[in-house]
């Protein structure tokens, strides 16, 4: 005999409330593009730094070495821009970090998606002779 059902099936755990995502109305925000050699992450925040929308090359559906392509960065930026526009974002200041190949493509696709791009600044961290870098690759 199968065990008796205890109650309605819910996705949330017992005693835990599910938070519904409220629609923010933020006309001006900041787009943070982190472009590494392996991936590109686009995060759109409000002026205080609270995340409104984000997307990455892996989140969009690319795996492995295809995540590091400019096309993957383009799709990630379009995806994040679409989500941000649902929250009312119309203008963004862009902060680019990292040496990856998807930097310029992500900025261009933010503009193409309908966001007005204000200032573009490079915030790549530069070491003042910090830790020792990894040894050279010999291929």
Curated annotation (Swiss-Prot):
Chain positions covered by the region annotation Disordered: 1-33, 118-139
InterPro entries, alphabetized: Ribosomal_uS11, Ribosomal_uS11_bac-type, Ribosomal_uS11_CS, Ribosomal_uS11_sf
Keyword RNA-binding found: yes
Statement: the UniProt record of this protein carries the keyword Chaperone: no
GO cellular component, one term: cytosolic small ribosomal subunit
Any one of the GO BP annotations: translation
Keywords: Ribonucleoprotein, Ribosomal protein, RNA-binding, rRNA-binding
Stretches with biased composition (Basic residues): 14-23
A Pfam family of this chain: Ribosomal_S11
Molecular functions (GO terms): rRNA binding; structural constituent of ribosome
Subunit structure and binding partners: Part of the 30S ribosomal subunit. Interacts with proteins S7 and S18. Binds to IF-3.
HAMAP family: Ribosomal_uS11
Function per UniProt: Located on the platform of the 30S subunit, it bridges several disparate RNA helices of the 16S rRNA. Forms part of the Shine-Dalgarno cleft in the 70S ribosome.
Family: Belongs to the universal ribosomal protein uS11 family.
This protein's name: Small ribosomal subunit protein uS11
Gene that encodes it: rpsK
């Amino acid at each position: 005999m199968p065990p008796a059902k205890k109650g309605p099936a819910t996705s949330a755990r017992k005693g835990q409330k599910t938070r519904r995502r409220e629609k923010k109305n933020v006309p001006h925000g900041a787009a943070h593009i982190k472009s590494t050699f392996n991936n590109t992450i686009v995060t759109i925040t409000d002026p205080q730094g609270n995340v409104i929308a984000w997307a990455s090359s892996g989140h969009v559906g690319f795996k492995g070495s295809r995540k590091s392509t400019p096309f993957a960065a383009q799709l990630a930026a379009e995806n994040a821009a679409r989500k941000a526009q649902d929250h009312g974002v119309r203008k963004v200041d862009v902060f680019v970090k990292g040496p990856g190949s998807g930097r310029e493509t992500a900025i261009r696709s933010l503009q193409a998606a309908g966001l007005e791009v204000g200032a573009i600044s490079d915030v790549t961290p530069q070491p003042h002779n910090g830790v020792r870098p990894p040894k050279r690759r010999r291929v």
